[in-house]
Amino acid sequence: LVCSEMCIRDSYTAICKRLSADENLKTACSEYPGIRILKQDEWETLCSFIISQNNNIPRIKGIIGRLCENFGDKLPGGGYSFPSAEKLASLESDDLAPLRAGFRNKYIIDAARKVAGGEVNLSALRNASDNEVRESLLKIKGVGAKVAECTLLFGFGRVDAFPIDVWVRRVVGELYPNGLPECMDGVRLSLIHI
C-alpha cells in the first residue's frame, strides 16, 4: 500500500537522470531529492480538486475538514473518513452550506451523482486510456482541464498528466520561452499556451 500510495516503485534515479539534461530541472532534482507524487483515492482526489478551484490552501483544508466532519464516518482513534460519492449524491447543494464552499457545492453534488450513478465510473476508468479518463471527468460540472489533469495525476497515478495553473504557466513561460527542453518529450503539455 505504501509503495503504491507514494509511487515508491517509480525509478527516481532514472527520472532525474533524464531530466538532468536541462539545467533548471537538474537543479530541481538536486535541491529536492526523493520528492514523490502522492497517489490518492480517485474520488477523494476528484472532490478535493473541485474544492481547490480559485481557492487557497488553508481554505481548501478547512472545506475538506468540514466535509469529512459533516458527512464522513467517525474513525477509531479520532477524525473522520472522506464521505463516499454515494453519501453525497443523496444530498442537495444547500445541504453543503456548512462547508462554506460557495459555488463549488453544486459541482461537488454533480460529481457525486455522476460517480455514484455510474455515468463516471472511477473503477472502470482505472483501465482506460488517459484521454478516456479525461473525457469522462470533463462530463462533470465544474471540472475543467486543470481538475481533470490533477485527478489523472494524483488519483489515477498517470504520471504523463501535467496540471497547468496560472503559476505553472508563468514559470514555464519564463524559464522556457521557446518551448520545453527535449528531456520533457512525451509529457502532455497541450494545455500550455505560452
Where are these regions (language model features)?
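HhH-family (HhH-GPD) DNA N-glycosylase catalytic core used in base-excision repair
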Residues: 2-192
